[in-house]
Amino acid sequence: MWRAFEPGLRQRLASLQSTASTQERVRAALLESLPSGRANIAEVSRRLGISARTLQRRLQAEDSGFNAVLASVREELARHYLASTELPCNEIAFLLGYEEPNSFFRAFHSWTGESPERHRQAQVH
């Protein structure tokens, strides 16, 4: 599955200009890192060529934080996968970097107030 997404994600990350905000650069790195299960601040800061502490400071300067950007990317991707694929929720949870599907279900419910399956069904109707 990862191999299908990897080329486009690598191209997107490489095409970001130095003028992109730190949040945009973190989002791009997360899009690449999530399916491989390495969506943590250490991995993202390594991909961006800065220390984890510098990354935290830069995100803070933009009134954000790593966990907020991670949650935003996960929510966006979850909505996309549910609306445009027939992947089972367990696979979506894996692609979003969750170790346990129940963690994904709880997070999705906190974002939307409904279960992933209910959200998918609502998109169909």
Model features per residue range: what roles?
Residues M1-H125:
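Extended mid-to-C-terminal alpha-helical interaction segments
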